[in-house]
Design a protein with these regions (language model features):
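Long, charged/polar, soluble alpha-helical segments
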Residues: 1-528
Length: 528
């Protein structure tokens, strides 16, 4: 509302303006009369000739001043809270935080998938070209990975409740999305040059032959991995191989998909459809790559279990020795004494299990570290080194299992599993020097293990939820379900409730990775 004093000033100004206008109106009238008389022989003063133009100028200025005062008063009334007869311009509401959060999560998933599939196809390009030719693409991928790692770190901090202020959290989401956009643009910028390097559309026959050779090699490796898994099931408790228990069957599904796609690529090539042949060979490459990831994960699990079994006795001995060294001070502290008694009970139970038959050495190591590790002493000491070695081994095994699951189910796994995996890797990569901070190194290794196991849990839940509605043909037919859940082909939007496979992903960011489209691709419908 305009204050009374200002309203009075505006009225006074308007009154003065009215008087001035009346005065100059009469002056102009008089001048005109005198001028008329002068033309009829009455002498006139030449200075009177200036009165008319000056009067006009003054009147115009007065009108402009009045209009300005009126406009200023109207604007003030409109923008002042409570101003009468006017309403403020509507301000668009801020985007809800949950919407921004969902968008940032989606950007992380899309960027992570783009980085993964770019790395996959870059490996095929390395096999076909020299290091100099793939140099620019390696650099782009390295930059994208760096941006993505920062985005995942920000996501992990948000998930941990940092920062607490919503405005600051919005800023973190904005930076996270910007990092993902930057990573994607970096890969997108190299997509055309990468296609020229591989020249799949010009010469798909060469890539088909290479994929067929890789397929034959993977068939042999999958058979060997199956024998490894059979041995693990016989030698250890079921929990020891549980993270990779289904990997052999999934690897076989990928090989079935590769066979189908290679046949389709050959047929397209014979028909002169090189674009379709190139798209089909990319599907085959993706399937072969994932079969290799699954088979390798089984072999790595076997090696990790064997190493954990070797480390378990020295780990138990290190804990026993350390507890004995501090027996005197433990007896003086009843609360600490109770904790140590529980730790000794765990050690005895682990020894009994390991000598009674099939057991899980990785799980046994974790139990020892969780219950006895806090009181077992300095990991920098020679006998305490077994603590850190066991913790690092457990973390690496958990990271391997989670990464293999995410890498082979990219179409189903969401943001949370990927974020925890990235956090686990960061903890393991930044282990403090054991000479200066041995307890910190042990703590980081155990944190990495916990985060990786959480990542695997989330990934398994995501895959189960993805498959819950059901797809015609089942989950293990090497067809549309395998291709979609694995991210070997991208999902194409459909209006009839179906999941329609689109093209295979390739090197590039979210804007370019879906540039290939095989014709007559299979269609997966939701089960009724």
């Amino acid at each position: 509302m305009t204050p009374p004093v200002k309203r009075a000033r505006h009225r006074a100004a308007a009154q003065r303006l009215t008087v001035a206008m009346a005065y100059w109106s009469s002056a102009v009238s008089g001048t005109g009369t005198a001028h008329a008389a002068g033309t009829h022989g009455v002498p006139h003063n030449s200075g009177s000739d200036f009165i008319l133009p000056i009067g006009v100028v003054v009147v115009v200025c007065a009108l402009a001043a009045y209009a300005y005062l009126k406009r200023k008063r109207r604007t003030h009334s409109r923008t002042t809270p409570g101003g009468s007869g006017a309403h403020p311009e509507p301000v668009p509401p801020a985007t809800p935080f949950d919407v921004l959060d969902d968008e940032a999560r989606a950007a992380l998933v899309a960027t992570d998938e783009a980085v993964r599939t770019s790395a996959e196809e870059l490996d095929f390009a390395r096999a076909e070209s020299d290091a100099k030719a793939v140099g620019p693409f390696t650099g782009a991928l390295t930059h994208a990975r760096s941006e993505l790692a920062t985005a995942f770190r920000l996501r992990q901090e948000l998930d941990e409740g940092r920062p607490e202020d919503e405005s600051a959290r919005r800023g973190v989401l904005a930076e996270m999305t910007a990092r993902c956009d930057g990573a994607g643009r970096c890969l997108d910028a190299e997509a055309d040059a990468f296609d020229r390097l591989r020249a799949l559309d010009q010469d798909p026959a060469r890539a088909i032959a290479a994929a067929e050779a890789a397929f034959r090699e993977l068939t042999t490796r999958t058979g060997a991995a199956e024998r490894t898994l059979t041995g693990l099931l016989r030698q250890y408790a079921p929990s020891a191989s549980a993270p990779v228990a289904g990997f052999i069957e999934e690897a076989k599904d990928r090989l079935v998909l590769a066979t189908t796609s290679l046949n389709a690529a050959r047929q397209a090539l014979d028909a002169g459809d090189r674009a379709n042949a190139a798209a089909q060979v990319r599907v085959a490459e993706g399937a072969v790559h994932q079969a290799g990831v699954l088979a390798d994960a089984v072999e790595r699990r076997g090696r990790a279990l064997a190493e954990a079994a070797e480390l378990l006795p020295p780990l138990l001995t290190a804990c026993d020795d350390r507890l004995a060294d501090h027996q005197a001070e433990l007896d003086a502290d009843s609360g600490r004494h109770e904790r140590i008694a529980r730790a000794r009970s765990v050690l005895a139970g682990v020894r009994e299990e390991s000598g009674a038959g099939p057991h899980d050495p990785l799980d046994a190591s974790r139990r020892v570290l969780e219950t006895a590790g806090a009181d077992a002493g300095d990991a920098a000491a020679p006998r305490g080194r077994a603590l850190l070695d066991s913790a690092v081994l457990a973390a690496r095994a958990a990271i391997d299992a989670a990464d293999a699951h995410i890498a082979t189910h990219g179409g189903a796994v969401g943001c949370r599993a990927r974020t925890r995996l990235a956090a686990a890797r960061a903890h393991l990569a930044q282990l403090p020097d054991t000479g200066s901070d041995a307890p910190g190194a042990l703590s980081s290794a155990r944190a990495a293990d916990a985060l990786a196991r959480e990542a695997l849990d989330h990934a398994e839940q995501d895959v189960a939820a993805y498959r819950t509605p059901g797809l015609a043909g089942g989950a293990g037919d090497g067809g549309p379900v395998t291709a979609l859940a694995g991210g070997i082909v991208l999902e194409s939007p459909a209006t009839d409730g179906s999941r329609r496979p689109g093209g295979p992903p390739g090197f590039g960011g979210p804007a370019t990775r879906a540039r290939r489209h095989p014709s007559n691709g299979p269609r997966a419908r939701r089960a009724p």
